[in-house]
Structures are given as C-alpha cells and as structure tokens.
UniProtKB/Swiss-Prot annotation:
This is Large ribosomal subunit protein uL1. The keyword Amino-acid biosynthesis does not apply. Belongs to the universal ribosomal protein uL1 family. SUPFAM superfamilies: Ribosomal protein L1. Part of the 50S ribosomal subunit. Pfam families: Ribosomal_L1.
Length: 230
C-alpha cells in the first residue's frame, strides 16, 4: 500500500519492535499527527476473548473525563413528556414514527448516537437492520435505552463513548484530539482501559489484554506494553 510523505516521515519516529509506555506512546501519537486538521487519537485493544461465545462479550460505555473533542449529534426516540425532556436536555433530534420513516425512506444518518425510551423500542426495533450495522442501535448496556433521557443526553454530550468487540476481538475507541495534550489524553486513556479491564468476562482465560495500539487518524500505529496497563 502506498503511504504519503507525511506518514513515511512519522513512521521514522516509531520503533516498530518496541512496546512503549502509555505516556510515551501518546506523546508519539501527537507528534505523528501531521495532518492539517486536528487529528483524533484512537486506541485499538485486542482482547484474549472469543466474541463468538455469548459469555465472552465485552460491551459497555464510559464517560471520558475530557470528552472526545467531537460535537456529538444525538437523536432521541421518545414521546410525550419524555420528548419534551429530551428537547430541553439538548437533543439534536426528537421524535417517533416520523423519524423512523425518515430513516427508512431517506437513508438519513445525520446523527452520531441514538437514544430511546424503553416504551419506544418496539417500533425502534424495526430499524435493527439499518442501525445495527452502523453501531447506532440503542442498547441498555450502553445506557442508550433509558427513561432518564436527560441524563443519557448529558452523559453523551459530556464525552460518553461506547466500546464493544468487533469480529476480530478488537475494541476501537477515540480518546480525544491531538491538541488535547498528554495529560488529558492520559486521563482519557486510563479511564477507558479501566472500564474495559473491569468488564473482563469471567469466562475469559489467559492474558486479557493481548495488544494495545495507539494512533492518530492519519499516523502509524504505536504499540503499548499491555503489561504496563493492567
């Protein structure tokens, strides 16, 4: 694969055989963020679990102390007083059947997170095949199915992110922007890793954190020593 000049320059700063300390890796991720925009710093964590088994799933949500640096657009499925509560709490879109039709008929995805009250899940369930593959389906474990819509919205706007395994047993999460600086990125990193370690399934055997890699949006991967995280 052809890599651009900036990527190649950034790669020279990285020792690909070394397992870095978390703080050092985050500093390097910021140095290798050479794009003209404020790159996102991402963490990719491979776990020693088998996601094919129901008792080895790892999924949840955590509020990063310094947020992600991204403005998050929230869609809420609610009615009556709960719809009013959602509007007052700062939801970007609030509705019911009319929004479901809009998504189905117009392929509309101008939002980042979907929240629903439990009584709306019967109709929201019709969107499973549309929202599911995009990771947008409301889920109680992520706190996006809730009667307390005001808290759900506040948490999301404050920097709550969802983490879950992909098919290769890897979790991919943003932990902020390159402009955050090392202290804020380390706070967010520790918070995310702490939540994932706490969520370790009882059925998981052997080493839980197989690998931890940090990268900027356009930069190379930097390996972190997983034994320095747990």
């Amino acid at each position: 694969m052809f890599r651009g000049k900036k990527y190649q320059e950034s790669s020279k700063l990285i020792d690909r055989l070394k397992l870095y300390e978390p703080s050092e890796a985050l500093e390097l991720a910021q140095k290798t963020a050479k794009a003209k925009f404020d790159e996102t710093i991402e963490v990719h964590i491979k776990l020693g679990v088998d996601s094919r088994h129901a008792d080895q799933q790892v999924r949840g949500a955590v509020v990063l102390p310094h947020g992600t640096g991204k403005k998050v657009r929230v869609l809420v499925f609610a009615k009556g007083d709960k719809a009013k509560e959602a509007e007052q709490a700062g939801a970007d879109f609030v509705g019911g059947e009319e929004l479901i039709s809009k998504i189905q008929n117009e392929n509309w995805f101008d939002y980042d997170v979907v929240v629903a009250t439990p009584d709306m899940m019967g109709v929201v369930g019709r969107l499973g095949k549309v929202l599911g593959p995009k990771g947008l389906m409301p889920n109680p474990k992520a706190g996006t199915v809730s009667m307390d819509v005001a808290k759900a919205i506040a948490d999301i706007k404050a920097g709550k992110i969802e983490y879950r395994l992909d098919k290769t047993n890897i979790i991919h999460c943003p932990i902020g922007k390159a402009s955050f600086g090392n202290e804020k990125l380390m706070d967010n990193f520790r918070t995310l890793l702490g939540a994932i370690i706490k969520a370790k399934p009882a059925a998981a055997k052997g080493q839980y954190l197989k690998s931890v890699v940090v990268t900027s949006t356009m930069g190379p991967g930097i390996k972190i020593n997983p034994l320095r995280v747990e």
